[in-house]
Amino acid sequence: HGGLDIRGFSRALVSNLQGGDVQGASTLTQQFVKITLQENALKRGDKDAAKAAVDKTYSRKLQELKYALNVEENFTKDQILEGYLNLVYYGDQAYGVEAAALNYFGVSAAKLNLGQSALLAGIVQQPTAYNPVINPKESQARRDVVLDRMQSLGLASAKDVTAAKKVAVKK
């Protein structure tokens, strides 16, 4: 695992310097750092620091990268992923996987089934587009992509994936 995606960072930098669409190149660790900085600032009541944590500036991105490299040195991939999933936005005013599980399914994250877990994993990429409350078809399609990927990685059996896909996502 690495704190910097060199190819993505270079692509985004060139595009941004050429005046094209503003692009990001954040690794999951960089996103975790950004969310953590913003969350800590909000807890302190420091609105300026919360805004600065997400500003689209090169200086902020470099600071984020420095922190991300430090996080990578001091935490395992699993610890970083856990921290990220406990802070990230899942849509519908749900921040963190526990809040999302309760919000969308009425159960704690520990009690999610395979299909529900895959749906929440898929939401993170685009919380509004894949929100099952407002976009159930898109959410279901994304869930199915995640299920297929889980199967291809050996994290779920074909039987379990087929069963999970049979459950429709409803508003």
Indicate where each model-derived feature is located.
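Non-catalytic structural connector segments
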Residues: S157-K171
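Peptidoglycan glycan-strand catalytic modules in the bacterial/periplasmic cell-wall system
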Residues: H1-S157
